[in-house]
Amino acid sequence: MSKKSSSSAARHSLTIRSKVTLNRILEITNNSVKIEINDEGTITGRYTGTQLATIDNTTNQDGTSSWSGKFMQVTDRGEVILTTGSGTGEPPNSKGIVKIRGEGEMWTQSPRLANLNGAKWTCEGETNIRKGSTVIYVDINEMEH
């Protein structure tokens, strides 16, 4: 891991690395395409585990995009965290990299992670649309209980 990425990861609550498992084209118009993206990956940081995601993404003619997603995270201790969110993407660069950002909310039944109930999160990261891989850095604004 490069110094830049390791210091970047240390600044954030979570780092999520995922791979696309399935894409479905939902709708095509003369100025956009809507696809469903299913991916799964690993979580490191505040807690460790895995994540499953279903994301509806609409890409416009100019390459910009908007997305909304549903995410299920399972920690290495078996705790489940559910999150929803939405955001935007810039047009891909010449290497197929899309810079994305977004925000959302999360919930869990875990007593240990109860401060995540109703917590807001923001994210930023990159998706490689050629490889179907994503790295996302998440910042969680935890609730006080």
Each model region followed by its residue ranges:
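Beta-strand-enriched cores of mature, soluble protein domains
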Residues: 2-145
